[in-house]
């Protein structure tokens, strides 16, 4: 019985790793869309978004089976519960990347033309996804804490982008709509960083049994 449980946990980890890889890829495509949006890119984003949604359903199904059939002990129960919370954040990461790609075509010009820091922000968010999933699979508390700290980097990028956008509007008020679209894109990337932080916090819960919302 325990061997079967361990095999199911391995399958759970494989699915989470795949979801994490898909999240990385969809963020990279969202970043690429800022400078080179095209129909093929948008199609690929939709495909990956659907794959993330399917991964969500698969992981949820594995977790429910483990909970209902295996009666996991406390530590295993935390790992399974954390996985169910994490996939919600990963699914939202996919949604927000799709929202970015949907927004870019309506802009009059390249989204990073006047403020390329957005691409650096996207890269930082992409790294957070990789580290957050690795932290879960390895049950690495130090890596989870590093992800939480990296959110400060994404937040700092957002603040700098926001100030730059205010400068764009002050310099030329007619560019207000462009600037607001730019701000929305930056906000989506900032939220992606927040979701990665949430994942890291659930890793902390799975390892220690404590979570900031439960204290």
Put a short name on every predicted segment:
Residues 1-215:
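Cytosolic, long alpha-helical scaffolding segments
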């Amino acid at each position: 019985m325990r061997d079967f449980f361990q095999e199911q946990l391995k399958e759970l980890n494989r699915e989470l790793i795949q979801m994490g890889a898909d999240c990385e890829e969809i963020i990279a495509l969202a970043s690429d869309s800022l400078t080179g949006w095209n129909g093929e890119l948008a199609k690929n984003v939709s495909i990956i978004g659907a794959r993330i949604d399917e991964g969500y359903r698969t992981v949820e199904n594995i977790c429910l089976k483990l909970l209902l059939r295996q009666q996991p002990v406390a530590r295993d129960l935390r790992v399974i519960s954390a996985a169910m919370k994490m996939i919600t954040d990963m699914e939202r990461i996919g949604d927000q990347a799709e929202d970015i790609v949907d927004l870019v075509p309506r802009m009059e010009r390249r989204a990073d033309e006047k403020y390329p820091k957005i691409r650096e922000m996207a890269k930082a968010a992409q790294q957070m996804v990789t580290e957050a999933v690795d932290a879960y699979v390895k049950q690495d508390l130090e890596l989870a804490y590093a992800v939480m700290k990296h959110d400060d980097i994404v937040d700092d990028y957002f603040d700098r982008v926001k100030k730059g956008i205010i400068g764009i509007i002050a310099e030329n008020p007619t560019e207000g709509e462009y600037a607001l679209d730019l701000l929305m894109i930056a906000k989506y990337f900032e939220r992606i960083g927040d979701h990665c932080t949430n994942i890291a916090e659930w890793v902390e819960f799975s390892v220690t049994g404590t979570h900031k919302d439960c204290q």
